[in-house]
Amino acid sequence: MNPAKRLTGSALLALAFLSVLWSAVAAAEATAERNQRLVERAFVNWSAGRGSLFDDLLSPTVVWTIRGNGPAAGTYHGREDFLRRAVRPFAQRLATPIVPRVEGIWAREDQVVVRWMGTATARDGAPYRNDYVWIFKMDGQRATRVEAFLDLVPYQDVIDRIALADPSPAAPSGERQVP
């Protein structure tokens, strides 16, 4: 084989390799962008009081881990387990739902990181404010794993300070958004 043909063959092989590599990079970027848009949309809807971030974004089989120390820290297996043991007991102690203010969203491949601040009013009239970082691992259009970082002291203060609301049938059944 003459040198010109060998060089042409090598160049074509390199171009083919770069094309495959570029396609993989483009697919990863497209996935990250799609995931970021899904999470952004869920937070926009939550801020506007539309829908339920937990229903709209979480897989029914999500594994949600709250990092840190305290009774709420730990791993919850499934959306319903998380709602039942962490979200509802907290939401029932609030006079207003938590309103999130997103401070940043970053995505890479199948992970989306959201840094946000939440504010609400507790049933005793005291303000609730907390800073959060949630890391979502996305699969399709649903989060299958979430790691949540927050200051558990103000969260636990609300839990300890305010008795659970009366869960009578007359109480509204809508899901409030919290931790």
Located regions from the model:
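Hydrophobic pocket/interface hotspot
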Residues: 39, 53-54, 62, 78, ...
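Bacterial N-terminal signal peptides that target proteins for export
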Residues: 2-13
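Alpha-helix initiation/capping motif
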Residues: 28-32, 71-79, 125
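Short, low-complexity N-terminal intrinsically disordered segments enriched in polar/charged residues
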Residues: 15-52, 56-60, 162-179
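A beta-strand edge to alpha-helix "cap/lid" segment located at domain peripheries
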Residues: 27-31, 88-179
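A solvent-exposed, acidic/Ser-Thr-rich amphipathic alpha-helical stretch
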Residues: 56-108
